[in-house]
């Protein structure tokens, strides 16, 4: 079933790893022959070394056997190329999620769902099942495993997509996570799923079911992407993947370029020279301005002629190179310039300013939605949410019904969701004297830790660390000695194996805490620190300087950020809120202040400086000012229908004929909407003189004193009902947060949205009046 070419590739990769593989594991692999042995050699030869060292052999064995069964059975009747099978069915890893045994578990849950269906219909059915299990919930950057996602019922987009890919692969459907590391037009990123159906790759939103493939709310955003990539854990390519462009190898992962399948692209050609010689092996950081900092989307390596290429979107990028003590930085608008000559030299200090351009949206080839099928899917999604909540609530109900629980335990048992048995078991093991510290320890860990930490790991920390209290202040002891959470790692025992899985700084903190010394990672730099005489001291002393920053109305990570330049990459520091005074390591820095415009473009002021040991620097930050006309852009909204009080349907396009119209989705009774209504009450006559005002209320028919006062004063108002919840797709089309009221769209004729805002800001009605006068 597996080809000689694949056998040779797998054996070669496995042989190169033999020194890293335990003898007992190697013996188990050699006990197999044929395809099963080849599959095991492939996984042990290509997966990240932590998987090879720490994943139980039985998990790998199960993944191989299950994948080979799906290939032999070929229940969908689709010819799946061997390289696509190897990378996107056989491989149990999707990205950097926590490794968990899942293949048979998901396959058993899904086999009836996919029985007798085409591969495309099976993929849609699996995604609906995924929605029944998991929904979106923002959380920290650590990626939970697929079983944790299932037991929790929640995950951020990277976790939803990893979960969905694992589910799809478990029933033999080739699937991969597709990722835009950073958007250019808004401060965010996104991950979704692609499935291979025999006629190519097709996308879908993970745990966001649709009635057909190639639909998803994120498509408007992806058409403005600067980079979209997929990930695989081997370089094996035969018939299915031979044409895919490799961007870079990152650890054991290979990143492949998918941008041209979503957005308009150009080929960027970069040359790096020093003097008259080409620079070979230089790392070229391709960055976007996001969350007020330059952030990597790709790292290229120059070839023997000093050249590197990247197919990317049409907008601004930042190129950063640090090579052998020489530096190069430059903003490039790839819609204008695609050939860049880089000549590294001195680090240039001082202020620069400009506009960082977001790409325009590529044309859409999406067909009109089938309203009847959309309605069916909406009903299925509502049912999925009910099933999911019932299952998640049952974990809490079953544990509390079968165990005698103290009232103070209940918040922790509920927060644990599907991990209730483990958190409950930990609490049941505590004696009366230790219980207060057990509860306080649980208060120090994250929501995600609560959902995927086992009782044994928590008990380890209680037994090893609690005896070290020795009269230490409770707060210091609990947060910086007893706390088993350090950085982004899963909570584990800090034995030899556990420490080997931590990075150097986290391992240093763990060892200090085990010895009874209060320790942490520096909030600013991430370096290990310990407490001495009431002050946090760096474990490894480095030259330090002092930085003082001031500024009004600026939020870190939104309108300003401080980053340190290291090996060509700008690493953000968590500085806290302004004003501030902080000691930071001597080095080269960029202090950025940004102002994002409605078009997605950003005004920026960058201050590059070098901080010397013992030096004290101070800066006052100010947001760049935009001209009023710069607040107007062009964004195409999707078709949408609202209803009058009699139930008659009105397309928004029919309500926005003419030069200017304001569509205001409101939630009367909610504080942000109430503030907006108070402004509207005072300025409605001036507003209605420059644009038509269309007010859309939720189908729940909410009202308030502020809305009644406004309606009483102005009498007949264009008021409609959002019975179809069109605010969500409209908000996403304008790159705003759904459900963040008031949601305002200033139209220059439908579907041309010239300005949009979500949430209340002081003076929003006055701003709309001024902008409408310009349309």
Predicted regions and their residues:
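Secondary-structure boundary elements
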Residues: 2-152, 374-496
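Hydrophobic/aromatic-rich core segments of domains that either
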Residues: 108-128, 137-147, 152-248, 257, ...
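Structural motif
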Residues: 255-282, 289-291, 548-559, 565-567
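Short, acidic Ser/Thr/Gly-rich low-complexity loop/linker segments typical of extracellular
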Residues: 290-312, 566-580
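Short Pro-Gly-centered beta-turn/loop motif in secreted/extracellular proteins
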Residues: 305-325, 331-335, 412-415, 577-599, ...
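Short active-site neighborhood of thiol/selenol oxidoreductases, capturing the structured segment around
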Residues: 652-680, 693-695
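Thioredoxin-like thiol-disulfide oxidoreductase module
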Residues: 701-740
